[in-house]
Amino acid sequence: MLLSVVAIALLAYLLGSFPAGYLAGRWLKGIDIRKEGSGSTGATNVLRVLGKGPALVVFITDILKGVLAVVAARAIASTNGLDPSAIAWLAAFAAIIAVVGHSLPVWLSFRGGKSVATSLGVLLALSPVVGLSGFGAFLLLLALFRIVSLGSIAGAITVIVLMLILPEPLPNKILGIASGIYVIYRHRSNLDRLRRGEEPRIGQRLSTNR
């Protein structure tokens, strides 16, 4: 059991911390994406700095990191003969590790993204209805206001609310609520700009005062 937990934690962190946005900046423009735009390695900053194509690739990659972390955790736990309850808890554990790994990658001095896409990935793997509902809320707010951070926060709130009211397994509830709160926490600077009316819309440049 202990070896399974260690293996799952290491693999989930390795997957979650894979720096897709950083590598896109290095490969396409020879830049450190952390020194451009908002300083995030996530798809939104990649969109701002590198354009739509690279941003879409990074977004999909970051989603897949979350999906693969959950799938791998289930596979490792199942191979070791663990019962369904233990598998569910280990899958949720891997999901949380992957989400945190995305935003705190050791390879980049713990400066990553805001874990939105990776959170979506783990939710799609663990609770597709909640994951798709959160993504739907994100798309709706994005379409109405063209502010990515507002959509991300709305999606996180939607996930939290649904996990509280729907009959989801306890491990999924804890993962969903924790990841939702974490995503909102990672958007602290965005919330400050939203309150001041300074948060950029898609296509607008971010102020140098982050």
UniProtKB/Swiss-Prot annotation:
Q: What InterPro entries does UniProt report for this protein, alphabetically?
A: G3P_acylTferase_PlsY
Any keyword Disulfide bond? no
Q: Which reaction does it catalyse?
A: an acyl phosphate + sn-glycerol 3-phosphate = a 1-acyl-sn-glycero-3-phosphate + phosphate
A Pfam family assignment? G3P_acyltransf
Q: Name the pathway it acts in.
A: Lipid metabolism; phospholipid metabolism
Provide the transmembrane region boundaries. 1-21, 53-73, 87-107, 122-142, 147-167
Q: Which domain of life is it from?
A: Bacteria
Q: Name one GO cellular component term.
A: plasma membrane
- Write the record's keywords in alphabetical order, separated by commas: Cell inner membrane, Cell membrane, Lipid biosynthesis, Lipid metabolism, Membrane, Phospholipid biosynthesis, Phospholipid metabolism, Transferase, Transmembrane, Transmembrane helix
Q: Please name the GO terms that the record assigns under molecular function.
A: acyl-phosphate glycerol-3-phosphate acyltransferase activity
Principal location class: membrane
Q: How does it sit in the membrane?
A: Multi-pass membrane protein
What's an example GO BP annotation here? phospholipid biosynthetic process
Q: What class of enzyme is it?
A: transferase
Intracellular or extracellular location(s): Cell inner membrane
EC number(s) given by UniProt: 2.3.1.275
Its quaternary organisation is: Probably interacts with PlsX.
Described by its record, this protein's role is as follows: Catalyzes the transfer of an acyl group from acyl-phosphate (acyl-PO(4)) to glycerol-3-phosphate (G3P) to form lysophosphatidic acid (LPA). This enzyme utilizes acyl-phosphate as fatty acyl donor, but not acyl-CoA or acyl-ACP.
Family per record: Belongs to the PlsY family.
HAMAP family linked to this entry: PlsY (MF_01043)
This protein is called: Glycerol-3-phosphate acyltransferase
Q: Which organism is it from?
A: Synechococcus elongatus (strain ATCC 33912 / PCC 7942 / FACHB-805)
Q: Could you read off the lineage of the organism from its UniProt record?
A: Bacteria, Bacillati, Cyanobacteriota, Cyanophyceae, Synechococcales
- List the gene name: plsY
